[in-house]
Amino acid sequence: MKNPSFDWERLKDVFYRSRAIGELKWPTQYEEFKCALSLTVIAVEIQDFIQVYNYFGQLLGKINLQRIHEDIIKFEFDKDEKLILVTKSSIKIVKGWSPLTIESVPLQDPTIDTIWDYHNGIMLLAKSRDIYKLNGNEWELLYENKDKKYNLLTKNHWSCNDDSIILLDVDHVYQVSTSNGALLKLITDSSWHKVTISSRGFICLYNMKDNKLQIFRDPARILMEHNLDSTPDDICWCGNDTVACSFEDEIKLYGPDGLYVTFWYPFTVTNLRAEVDGLKVITTEKIYFLSRVQPQTSNIFRIGSTEPGAMLVDSFSLLEDHAPKAIEILKNFVLEKGVLDCIAAAIDEFEPKLQKMLLNAASYGKASLQYKSFDASIFVNACNTIKLLNCFRSFGIFLTVEEYRCISLKGVIDRLLKYHRYYECIQICKLANERFLLGYVFTEWAKDKIKGSPDMEDDELLDKIKSRLSVIDMTDTLQMVAVAKVAYLEGRFQLSRNLALLEKNEEARIEQLYNLDDDSIALKECIKVQNYSLTISLLIALSKKLTNSQLTKLLIIDMFNNPLYLYYMRMDKAYLYDFYRQTDRFIDLAHVLLQQGKEQQSLHSFLPQIKDLYSQVQNSEVVNNTIEQLQRQEKLWIYQESLGKRFAISFTNMTLDQTLSKLIETGQDKQVKEIVKKFKISEKKLYHLKCKTLVEAKKFDELLQFAQSRKSPIGYMPFYTYLKSRGHMDKASPYVNMIPGLSYQEKKKLYVECRGFRDAIQLAGKEKDIPGLKEIYNIIPPNEPELKALANETMSRI
């Protein structure tokens, strides 16, 4: 295998090389043609067409310039590789190739001034030389040259990158910031005729009169100066740190200390393009990539190198025939560094044979390291990257690893999708095992299929999309809503609806159906997935879009037995009233009025309506009972009004129990008997209410008198319990002896619980229960010495 270093050139301590990456296959019989390069494609203007090719010379798209109806003064690619056509009055951005889609960004008033030049999103006007920046689809004024601060004679007199614009005035050099338009004078009283700025801000100036190059980042510190032997055809950056000049059929790279290296080509050099890590050279027959040789690659292939990478490759080459010697070599260098160098060099190579050899050497070295001392993922990731880069190259996309890192895998996919190269995209996604990107490719294919198939019926298109969908089985990564939106914009509403129903994301699916005004389907889908928050959100949106009657109809049809929205609207009495009235739900409507009456503290005014609503329902025992209760309530209100007039006390909104309690509390025995008789209150309920009321009113004497007045129908335990639960322990003790059927132990326990220790001692003494007395003695608090003495005295008597 030929050593690749034989084709290298050395510039001081750095090696450079030029590698062919493609042959030009467009029609070359025309002498007059213009071309523009991007990272992955070439645009060529021949006669009345601009044709776009990949680096294999495959035609990807073309534009008939006669249909533009304006003279094209320039064309170039932007960072996303959209083709930009520059005319005097506008720029035209090619958004799509099949069908051809062009978006125009015109000047505000082309009658006042016209476009002079354009590059990398920056535009200069012809008369004023005002500077504009393309911001989305609008022009943003960066600097207005109203004082004629500078005058640019040719289009070589300016250059720009993402951060700065360099302007070569007749006498000075200016810099304009692309972020705020600030103008700065870099160099005064200095004349230059060409400028180019690198992506990292290094500036190269060329003076045609003196045939001199000057390179700097800060004008106060000149990095390099070169006096050239002849006038270059073009000047361009090779990467970010070396300047290249083209001279007919050769390229010269200039380094420090007046050094340079020359690369000769068998054909005339026509165009140059600076890349992040090198230079693309276009000749009349081929495309070359000129770049720095990475240190790892240089260490391995440099003649006589004893670096770890070179030693590992030597050892691997001897392994088959001279294994002992190969193993001995492994002991003479840092093996891990050799493995890493071979991996890095393999990624840097274009030739598969060299890649394979270097990876085999790295694998051999890795296997010779101690177990788990090397991160195997480095090797695996390198292999995957090399496979991807080789796959790209097989499709006519020649990327270095540095360029690939800059644009990412999705960037490669997007560039292929521009030209509808779906097969290549799918192959790349499968190789990279990128399920999400595969779904993205399918989504873009489906969108383009809809746009490009005006003669196909909706059902036919849907079947086509579904059949492709079943093959790739990537429904979890698809954005079917995006496809549905395209169908909607194309006027295919039924197709849009059916595609939206294929969307896996619930919120996106419902939103698209809502936007299509398929309210019923959207609501059914919400209910189907049982996403209650989403259902409520949809219904709120629908309530703003539909009338009340339309929304009610929707709820009746699709949510007849689902009270979710009614529960959400439970505080909106006006809505509930309207809904129940429209749906003839009389009982629910009565409940709304009942609640409204309670909230307004005027329930009696709503009662006739409520009774009338209940009467609409026939043959219902529950309804009949409710009507009886309402009549009873109405009767109570009338009685409460009479009581209020008689005693000047408000009984409004009191329940029957509260009314009775109030009468008991105020000592209105006559009215108590009257209300008991009038509303047929049971004796047991009366006793409970009176007992509870007197306890809460702390009328203990009256309570005891009430308890002793006659035999209680509820017994006397409730008296004891009410007093004890309210904290009136000392008042509860007398009722223990009234409770019939209690055993000695039960009575003693009740006395102790209500702290009736004296009664408990007397009871235990009567029963001659010394253990019980001791138990009581131990429970008596220390601050009750009299009770303790009584307990001792009682025990001594026994």
From Swiss-Prot:
Record's protein name: Vacuolar protein sorting-associated protein 16
Alphabetical list of PANTHER family matching this protein: VACUOLAR PROTEIN SORTING VPS16, VACUOLAR PROTEIN SORTING-ASSOCIATED PROTEIN 16 HOMOLOG
- The organism's superkingdom is given as Eukaryota
Gene Ontology molecular function: actin binding
Q: Summarize the protein's role.
A: Essential for vacuolar protein sorting. Required for vacuole biogenesis, stability and to maintain vacuole morphology. Required for growth at elevated temperatures. Acts as a component of the HOPS complex that acts during the docking stage of vacuole fusion. HOPS is an effector for the vacuolar Rab GTPase YPT7 and is required for vacuolar SNARE complex assembly. It remains bound to SNARE complexes after vacuole fusion.
Q: Does the keyword DNA-binding apply?
A: no
Offer one example of a GO biological process linked to this entry: protein targeting to vacuole
Q: Name one GO cellular component term.
A: endosome
Q: Which organism is it from?
A: Saccharomyces cerevisiae (strain ATCC 204508 / S288c)
Subunit-level organization: Component of the HOPS complex which is composed of PEP5, VPS16, PEP3, VPS33, VPS39 and VPS41. HOPS associates with phosphoinositides and the PX domain of VAM7. Interacts with VAM7.
Location of the protein in the cell: Cytoplasm; Vacuole
